[in-house]
């Protein structure tokens, strides 16, 4: 018997614009103590994504709503709550000590 669990739909992510092309993205239904801040910074030719959350819902479509530029995903460290969606992005950067995790999350 298969059971399907639905994790919140289109409102999983909360997008907060801070102005000047900087947005805070939060996983709305994740407890504060477990949720990391996901930052999207718009650039002239490409954008930066700082951390990627737990990865319980796809993040890349949310980023596409903010910008059509290529994204460089930068992970501050390799804890699961910061790298969950990094696999969705072609360019992933982070500390050398975690390079294997970023290459194959």
Regions found by a protein language model. Give the residues of each.
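Short gly/ser/thr-rich secondary-structure transition/capping motifs
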Residues: 5-7, 32, 75
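Metallo-beta-lactamase
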Residues: 2-20, 96-105
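Intrinsically disordered, low-complexity segments enriched in polar/charged residues with Gly/Pro
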Residues: 1-4, 25-28, 79
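Active-site HxH/HxHxD metal-binding segment of metal-dependent hydrolases
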Residues: 56-105
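Conserved beta-strand hairpin/beta-sheet module of binuclear metal-dependent hydrolase folds
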Residues: 11-65
């Amino acid at each position: 018997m298969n059971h399907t669990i639905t994790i919140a739909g289109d409102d999983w992510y909360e997008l907060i614009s801070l102005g000047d092309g900087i947005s805070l993205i939060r996983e709305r239904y994740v407890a504060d103590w477990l949720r990391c801040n996901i930052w999207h910074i718009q650039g002239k030719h490409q954008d930066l994504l700082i951390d990627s959350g737990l990865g319980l819902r796809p993040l890349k479509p949310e980023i596409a709503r903010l910008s059509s530029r290529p994204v460089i995903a930068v992970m501050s460290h390799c804890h699961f709550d910061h790298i969950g969606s990094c696999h969705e992005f072609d360019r992933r950067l982070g500390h050398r000590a975690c390079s294997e995790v970023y290459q194959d999350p």
